[in-house]
Structures are given as C-alpha cells and as structure tokens.
Amino acid sequence: MPRPAPARRLPGLLLLLWPLLLLPSAAPDPVARPGFRRLETRGPGGSPGRRPSPAAPDGAPASGTSEPGRARGAGVCKSRPLDLVFIIDSSRSVRPLEFTKVKTFVSRIIDTLDIGPADTRVAVVNYASTVKIEFQLQAYTDKQSLKQAVGRITPLSTGTMSGLAIQTAMDEAFTVEAGAREPSSNIPKVAIIVTDGRPQDQVNEVAARAQASGIELYAVGVDRADMASLKMMASEPLEEHVFYVETYGVIEKLSSRFQETFCALDPCVLGTHQCQHVCISDGEGKHHCECSQGYTLNADKKTCSALDRCALNTHGCEHICVNDRSGSYHCECYEGYTLNEDRKTCSAQDKCALGTHGCQHICVNDRTGSHHCECYEGYTLNADKKTCSVRDKCALGSHGCQHICVSDGAASYHCDCYPGYTLNEDKKTCSATEEARRLVSTEDACGCEATLAFQDKVSSYLQRLNTKLDDILEKLKINEYGQIHR
C-alpha cells in the first residue's frame, strides 16, 4: 500500500488562536440565508427537479437511483477518462457516521467510473486544520483496491482549511510525478471538494489559480456549508458545479448527478450519429461510421455506396456481370444463351426448340447460340432468310432428262419424250417407237412424203407441249407468290 504523504501543519500563530476560532456561534438555518439555494432540489443544469428520496440502508441502492457500477440508461453512457481528486473535509464538525457517509459517496462515484491506467485515475486529499494526501493518482489501478483504500481513511482534527487543501491538491496531487497525465493527453483534471463548514482561510485566489492551471472544481456543501465560499471555489457555470444537501444522510444521492456529469453519451445508442449503415462507438462519446458488406464509405464519412463488384474482376461470370443496388451482383448471358444452375456459366439456348425462330421449313441451331433457316429439297431460301420458294430443277439443267424436263408443283420434276419416242425404265432416256423407226427408214418413193408427214406431226406435238409448259409455269408463279405473301 502506498505510503501516505505527511500532513501539512499550520504556523504556530494560527495554532495559538485556534481555540478562539472554535467558539460556538449562532448558525442560522442555511435555507434562510440570502442567496443560499438547496441544490439537491434542482435537476441537472439547475432545472427544477425532485428532492432526494430518504436514505436507504447502507449497501442497498436508494429508491430512484441506479445500482453501483451500472450507468443509468446502461449502454448509452460510458465514463470519460479523468484525473479525479476528491478533497474531503474531515474536521471535528463531521461526525464519524457522517464521515462514513462521505466515504460511501466517494465509493459510489468510483462505482460509476471505469478505473485503470488508461481510464480514470483517482486520488484522495483529506483535510481539516492539516492536509493529508491519502493516496495519489498512480496508487490504484483497479476499482476494488481503490474502494478498499477509501474505506480505510480516518478523520483528521479540527479546522476547515479548504484553501490549503486546494493548494495541496494542485501542487502535489495533480502532477505527472503523482500520476496525472501530461497536458498533451487532453485528459480532464477534476477536483470534487466536500465540506460542511465555512473555510478558515482564503479560497477565492487559490481556487482561481487552480482553475487557471486547468483543474475543473466541483463544490459540494453539506448542512452549514457557506454558499458564497462554495461559489468562490467552484468553476463556471456555477449551476453545474455547485451542489448542496441538507444532511450527510443524503449526500450519496449526488453520485448519480456526477455520473451524468462524467458520462460520455454514446451517439450510436442515442441515434444521433447520422451513419447510413453502421455506427461504431469509440468511447468518450466519439464514434465512426462503417458500411455493410458490399459497400464503401463515402467522403462524408457517413453515407455508403455500393462497391462495383464487377469492376473487381472477382465475380466469376462467364459472360456479363451486373451490379445490384444491394451492393452485390449477378451474372447474365449473351443473347442466345441461358444461365446455368451455378448462376455463373452460360449454355447456348435451343432457339429452334423454343418455336420462336420463324423458319418456314427447317430451323438449325448454331454453336454460337444462334440459329439459321433452311428449306426442304427442291426449295430455295428467300432473301428474308426465313421463307422458302420452289426451285425450278428443269431450269437448272441438272435434271438428266434426255428429251424433255417437266417441272411439277412440288418442287420436283419428271422426264418426257418427243413424239414417236417412249420413256425408258430409267425414267430419263427415250427410245423411238416401232412406227417412228419404220417411217424414218423407208426408201420407197413415198419416203419423202412420209418424212414430211412425220415432221408435221412432231411439230404439232411440240406446239402442244410448249402450250402445256406455259400453263405449268404460270401455275408455279401463282403458287410461289401465294407462299411468299402467306
């Protein structure tokens, strides 16, 4: 356990005059003093509030207060790191039971704080006519040991040297050697002075110096405490730094007020963070915004934009990657392809099976996922690449007929023979009939006439055939026109 610092004693002259200072005087009711306010009847910030409820038995949480160690509105508030020094009056006017109440008050405040080297550090300065530093800021780093040390503190003697106590705290407790943090750390330096009497030394100048050095002073007055002196010791604004209770029996109720004072509100819980997606508490009332998976934080550090997952080239899509508004993505396929079950690769569609190809005769799937149209034998594909027209095989000259090729209406043809000839079994070649052979081979005098007669007969046959062919071609044209405009 750290060794207590030696008490600081007054000059001999003051000690000789001390009995005169202790003569009892008529103390008017503090409530009746001009300008004296009962601060326990006011809420935070000086607004009207409830009076403290009657004191609960030791160890039991008072009605309307939080349990020790649990912040009111748990989760909303986290204590800020502080260098905190309690300056407690233990003069003879503070009875032993009342001094116990003061220690309970100190312990209750400690319960609401996060204690540790990187969190709040606590020291206690005990004073009466002398001043004693019970333990320094660096002495205890855990809450249990700290509260045990508070419990071991004993009262000193007569006298109320509040100014000397503040000076001692400033010179010896709030130093780097004693455990205070460097000014560059921006850790607040806070002193809470608890007294029930009028200071017997000057407090205004020493309090002003303490405040000028960066120490924030809170003054808690009990019973016959002098309000003017409390105001001289406390920092501005006074309505936030001066407290008063009528008896030590209710002083511990003020612990909740200090809990609110030292609380760093969590904007993430309060809903004031303005983060579009996720709010992360950093402690000390600070926070930062983060984004859900698939999003990135914008320059304003509050709103989020979807990541371009497709641009990252990690999507695995075989054909096309499409960003979604949700910050994710999905795969699509080129025209003529369909997405496989793995939702990434693509397979060519069977456009012909879908029945949407528009081919008049035959639809053929291509390897590219597309298709093309073809026509039945004897037909040719039109310029629209979908419809078909009858092909004139006789005109193509590939029919193989020896004499005459006759086109049929079904994109086919058949062979015919000149008059005097008959079609052979191969349906292509012709052979002269017996009559024709006889007419051609005659050598008698009538042969010339017979030849002329044969020629006339052949000419007549040819004329009839030409007429028949013209009729057939006309019918084919009409049929083809009807198929194109169907």
UniProtKB/Swiss-Prot annotation:
GO terms for biological process: cartilage development; extracellular matrix organization; skeletal system development. Disulfide bonds join C268-C279, C275-C289, C291-C304, C310-C321, C317-C331, C333-C346, C352-C363, C359-C373, C375-C388, C394-C405, C401-C415, C417-C430. Residues 456-480 form a coiled coil. The modification Phosphothreonine is found at T442. Expressed only in cartilaginous tissues, such as vertebrae, ribs and shoulders. Residues 32-75 are annotated as: Disordered. GO terms for cellular component: collagen-containing extracellular matrix; endoplasmic reticulum lumen; extracellular matrix; extracellular region; matrilin complex. Can form homooligomers (monomers, dimers, trimers and tetramers) and heterooligomers with matrilin-1. Interacts with COMP. Component of a complex containing at least CRELD2, MANF, MATN3 and PDIA4. This is Matrilin-3. The lineage of its organism: Eukaryota, Metazoa, Chordata, Craniata, Vertebrata. The gene is MATN3.
